[in-house]
Amino acid sequence: MQHDDVIWDVVGNKQFCSFKIKTKTQNFCRNEFNITGLCNRSACPLANSQYATIKEEKGICYLYMKTIERAAFPARMWERVRLSKNYEQALEQIDENLIYWPRFIRHKCKQRFTKITQYLIRIRKLTLKRQRKLVPLSRKVERREKRREEKALVAAQLDNAIEKELLERLKQGAYGDIYNFPIQAFDKALEQQDEASASESSDEEEEDDEESGKREFVEDDDVEESDLSDFEDMDKLGASSDEDKPSSESEEESSGEEDEKEEKAPKAKSKGKAPLKGHLIRKRPHVEIEYEQETEPQQKAKVT
């Protein structure tokens, strides 16, 4: 059996307790189940067999209750009840569960619950509110950073000026090859040229695709002027043959001699490779014409 007075005489009255903290004015208790935090007979969780308190775990409040019936079972000594987040409903739960407890414990439980809810609300406000964080900086560091910023601006301006100058020289053709200069500017220019050439090639391909379906009429290159002239000469000869039927055989012989001379002339010229002067002599086709004469009407005339 548990005797509360005996426990208090051993622990509280000027005796040793591991949870006790002595000061010049008052003694405090470090036990987590202590309802007030003070070391006295009414608030001691060890010397009271019927006891209750409020604890907070991860933003949730719980009501812990201890009775003398569970004193022989340390693992099941405390009964825990979860309280509602609504303040009024939580107070009603405390009154319902602590009907037969002393009035002092009931009042202190309500007081402890109000304090816990207040600091939980304060924590939520602080987490939502933005706070300024002051970081001390020495003057030397500020001066150093300003100098670095100024140097960086000057270097950036110089780099831009050098890049423009190099691009102008490259466009003018001052450099035959790329030397040990900053290569980034040249790379940018080359990329732009490649993009321009790629766009031109794509335009040409599009034009070819557009013109692929068109139809055109083209002259025949195989037909030469000499062939056309030969056809014209044939027509002329045909016409002249109809007109010159009564011509004599002497004309045939003279034409044959002229043809032989013309055949010999190119053979003599072909021996050397001298350039030809004037117009080329076109060869005419050799044509043999046979004439038939009728003598019967003349004989009839003589007979008459």
Curated annotation (Swiss-Prot):
One Pfam family, short name: Ribosomal_L28e
InterPro entries referenced in this protein's UniProt entry, alphabetically: Mak16 (IPR006958), Ribosomal_eL28/Mak16 (IPR029004)
Disulfide-linked positions: none
Keyword Nucleus: yes
Annotated Acidic residues bias: 201-211, 218-233, 249-261
Compartment list: Nucleus, Nucleolus
GO cellular component: nucleolus; preribosome, large subunit precursor
One GO BP: maturation of 5.8S rRNA
UniProt entry tagged with the keyword Nucleus: yes
UniProt keyword list: Nucleus
Region entry Disordered, spans: 190-304
Coiled coil: none
Family, per entry: Belongs to the MAK16 family.
Stated name of the protein: Protein MAK16 homolog B
Name of the gene encoding the protein in the UniProt record: mak16-b
